[in-house]
Amino acid sequence: MIIPVRCFTCGKPLGHLYAVFKQRVLAGEHPGKVLDDLGLVRYCCRRTLMAHVEWIDDVLIYEKR
């Protein structure tokens, strides 16, 4: 839904890195290289960014009853 502010496992701040990660991957760079450049070496942090799916726009179209 919304990008986590911190890694669920180790607690490293990640929220500020997602926009850069997404922009560079959409530009055609390899995700692994982007994560290396951002300084994410722990696999828990890498998993958090790579596995994130933005569903917030799809969820917001439904009304709450």
UniProtKB/Swiss-Prot annotation:
Zn(2+) binds at C7, C10, C44, C45. One of its GO terms (cellular component) is DNA-directed RNA polymerase complex. GO terms for biological process: DNA-templated transcription. Its EC number is 2.7.7.6. GO terms for molecular function: DNA binding; DNA-directed RNA polymerase activity; zinc ion binding. It catalyses: RNA(n) + a ribonucleoside 5'-triphosphate = RNA(n+1) + diphosphate. This is DNA-directed RNA polymerase subunit Rpo10. The lineage of its organism: Archaea, Thermoproteota, Thermoprotei, Thermoproteales, Thermoproteaceae. The gene is rpo10.
